[in-house]
Amino acid sequence: MRFFDREKELNYLKTYVQLEPNSILFVYGPKSSGKSTVMRRVIKELENSNIVFFYYNLREHATYSKEEFLEVFFEKDKNKVVRNNLILDLKVFKIGIEENYDFSKLSLNDVFKKIKSSINTVIKNGKKPVLIFDELQKLKNIYFNGNKPLLNELFNLFVSLTKMEHLCHVICLTSDTLFIEEIYRNSSLKNASKYYLIDWLRKNSIRNILKEEGFSEEEINYCLNYLSLPYEIVDLIENKKLGLTVEETIKQWINIEKDGLKYLIDTTDLDVEKIYMPYLSLITR
């Protein structure tokens, strides 16, 4: 996907990872607003720097249990820092663990020791480690020894790595607004975390992008009432190349939303007319 106008966000994150670690950074925003794309661009542009990125895209994995989490998080290898060869387009790494290690015997304290040992190895080599978790909330329902919630214990570790010891940056990406609210109310993270919003694209940015792609002023003005997300712009540009008009593409979107609302209405016992009809009238105008 084309990298749309995100210079402000890109510069913020590139600068942030080069500062001394002092807090956990939560990067949040609407689904599909481009958080992962921006973060991956940061990694790409800094791949020849002295920064070592440990990047975990949790949306790609079914991390529903302790064992699955460990298999995603660690790479069995003789080295403590291992190149993640499953991500071909980025120079990113995983925490190494002994090849004969039995994951079923790994305690939470063992996990933390392994993480810290790998981070210290990076630092001893004169480099700066950065831990990145994409869609961190997927770890919410994982418990370790003694039914300890993994996420709460990870946050304690993150505070130690950043605020207390200044060893490593920790960046957590999420599109779950309820999760962000939970984090914000977490007293253990007070004064130990920062928040950065990657929101929908601004209208001026959308206008400039569409102008570059050859859309007329009339088409652009029509689009601005409906566009906000990068994937929508890509869809609009691709459909134009395929011969669909702007109106036809947007009508497709509206019909999809309308069908979704209709399904919701058909499968609920709530007062349909009172709750949903005002919204249906808006999207069918």
Residue ranges of predicted features:
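Short, conserved phosphate/pyrophosphate- and ester-handling motifs at nucleotide-, phospho-/glycolipid
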Residues: 6, 36, 229-230
